[in-house]
């Protein structure tokens, strides 16, 4: 059995270099919520050195709140902003002799696109128009995945090791109880359930079916490195191969 293990990087965390030795895919911040041209270049070089698949991590323009502010923007604006960010990272990757593999939206852009078909459509169209061979990463079972499929993009359905789930398969909003899982044992058990059994237990106790093709480890998490090592060991023990 294979699984992709991804992390959001280039967001100002000191653990980026070490995480790149543990994950198979990196989602690199493109300047709208975190990062800048130099951090993008540094992350690209480190990812290439470690053989890690590179992806763009576009966001709403919200550096003050790390891309976590809900916004109501016209789809055409979201299309342009997404295209702009993908293009910026793509230029750096190309200049370093690499190939960009995927796009995964960040924060509130990701969460809103999971439920808003118009927003999802704008993102999927931007990815397709830039390079139809790129993989679109989105929340498992979401509108973003469906929009990607309509544009005939390859999609990857994502699950989260350290986030609580609602009964409908969506993430618990960050400001609500149960949104973040701080206990490593609980996060590990949830991840293994999602990957091996295709199910997740919601915060209300309801089991929900989920498709896990890629697992996200948040690079800004307090215990990201230690948890990544434990998760890799657990996968190895169960003959689950980490591969992009």
Curated annotation (Swiss-Prot):
Per its record, the protein catalyses: 5-oxo-L-proline + ATP + 2 H2O = L-glutamate + ADP + phosphate + H(+)
Signal peptide coordinates:
none
The keyword ATP-binding appears for this protein: yes
In the Enzyme Commission scheme, what number(s) does this protein have? 3.5.2.9
Q: Which InterPro entries match?
A: Glyco_hydro/deAcase_b/a-brl, LamB/YcsF/PxpA-like
Under SUPFAM superfamilies, the record lists:
Glycoside hydrolase/deacetylase (SSF88713)
The entry lists its GO molecular-function terms as: 5-oxoprolinase (ATP-hydrolyzing) activity; ATP binding
Q: Which UniProt keywords apply?
A: ATP-binding, Hydrolase, Nucleotide-binding
GO biological process: one example: carbohydrate metabolic process
> Keyword ATP-binding: yes or no?
yes
**Pfam families, alphabetically?**
LamB_YcsF (PF03746)
Record family assignment: Belongs to the LamB/PxpA family.
Q: What does this protein do?
A: Catalyzes the cleavage of 5-oxoproline to form L-glutamate coupled to the hydrolysis of ATP to ADP and inorganic phosphate.
Assembly state and interactors?
Answer: Forms a complex composed of PxpA, PxpB and PxpC.
Q: Which HAMAP family match?
A: PxpA
NCBIfam families the UniProt entry points to: PRK05406.1-1, PRK05406.1-3, PRK05406.1-4, PRK05406.1-5
Q: What is this protein called in UniProt?
A: 5-oxoprolinase subunit A
Source organism of the structure: Salmonella typhi
Identify the gene encoding this protein. Answer: pxpA
